[in-house]
Amino acid sequence: MATEFTVAEPDVLVATTLFLIERGVTPYQFSVAAGKGIDTSGATERLRSAFAAIGRSPRFSGNGPDILGISDSEWWVVECKGSGTGQPQTQRNNFDRALASVVSYYEEEPQGVSTQQQGVTVCLCLALPATRAYLNELQRRVRSPLRRRLNLWVLLCEPSSRSIKPVSPDAQF
């Protein structure tokens, strides 16, 4: 995979956070990835700074979904994944782990929210760079019936601009 398609997971997480805020969803918990080549402290600082600008302080967790967010009508559970320069098999394995994680977060009702927020819609979300490898896997393995049943959104992070293209559960890739 070419280097222009390298998108670090923290970049996907920050772009997804900005998308959620624009949608009216308040992210309240983050689990920032750690590992080889990942600038965890940089991503954490970027999130802290962004939230300080709006007078909030995000909560960080060492495990679970990458982002939890709530609005008056939606509860978002987000799994983010970056792309690297690894072999195609590595990219497929990363995709498999991300898909398995987001599906494992499925709930019929929001968890850990106030009683006033219990009736909101649960939105699962897989946020990925819009690379050829990930797009192929999405088209091949994450078909519309599954996305509709789970209310699974896919957020595609454009590698060059880091902007998000949302794909709703009813839309095609």
Model-assigned labels for residue ranges:
Residues 81-141:
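Catalytic cores of nucleic-acid endonucleases
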Residues 72, 117-119, 147-149:
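Short, well-ordered coil/turn elements that cap or connect secondary structure elements
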Residues 21-22, 72-74, 120-122:
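Short glycine/proline-enriched coil/turn segments at helix->beta-strand junctions
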Residues 123-173:
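Domain-level recognition of nuclease-like catalytic cores that cleave nucleotide substrates
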Residues 2-25, 35-41:
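Nuclease catalytic cores
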Residues 4, 29-77, 91-94:
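Active-site metal-binding core of divalent-cation-utilizing nuclease and nuclease-like domains
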